[in-house]
């Protein structure tokens, strides 16, 4: 696994994920199916690198799906965009186990900061959008929070958004 502090991607073949940390758990399988479909459609249209912020919720689910699809999708890669070292230190044990497994198997891990700071999530979201040509979102329309910021930033930059909500 490559570990770098900053990198630039071939934006033309990269997609990023954004989504809410919390969602209706009874909808988990429906969300998983929609994410899988969006990832496969992006892959069929030339997207091979998928960037996840590895936050609890949609980010980890999307990363798990990418990892599960890699054996049947040659050239598909998973990039972890980690806002700061120690991001998962406060995760619940089950989420931490998923996070650690995905970190170990990610094709590239980018840690944007060694330390926690106030705007770390927004900086991570901006990094992902600026390095992607597609945003796959699970966005419910609320006009606040990181998912809103990322969705809005992609729209301002003219980056296509596939909203699976």
What feature does the model see in each segment?
Residues 2-165:
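Acidic/glycine-enriched connector segments
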């Amino acid at each position: 696994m490559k570990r770098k502090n900053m990198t630039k991607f071939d934006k033309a073949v990269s997609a990023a994920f954004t989504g809410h940390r919390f969602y209706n758990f009874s909808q988990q399988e429906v969300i998983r199916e929609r994410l899988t479909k969006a990832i496969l459609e992006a892959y069929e249209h030339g997207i091979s690198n998928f960037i996840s912020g590895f936050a609890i919720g949609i980010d980890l689910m999307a990363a798990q799906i990418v990892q599960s699809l890699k054996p049947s999708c040659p050239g598909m890669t998973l990039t972890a965009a980690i806002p700061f070292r120690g991001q998962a230190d406060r995760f619940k044990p089950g989420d931490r186990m998923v996070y650690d497994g995905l970190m170990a198997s990610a094709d590239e891990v980018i840690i944007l900061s060694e330390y926690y700071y106030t705007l770390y999530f927004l900086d991570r979201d901006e990094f992902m959008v600026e390095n992607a040509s597609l945003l796959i979102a699970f966005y419910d329309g609320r006009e606040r929070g990181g998912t809103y910021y990322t969705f809005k930033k992609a729209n301002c930059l003219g980056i296509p958004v596939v909203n699976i909500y």
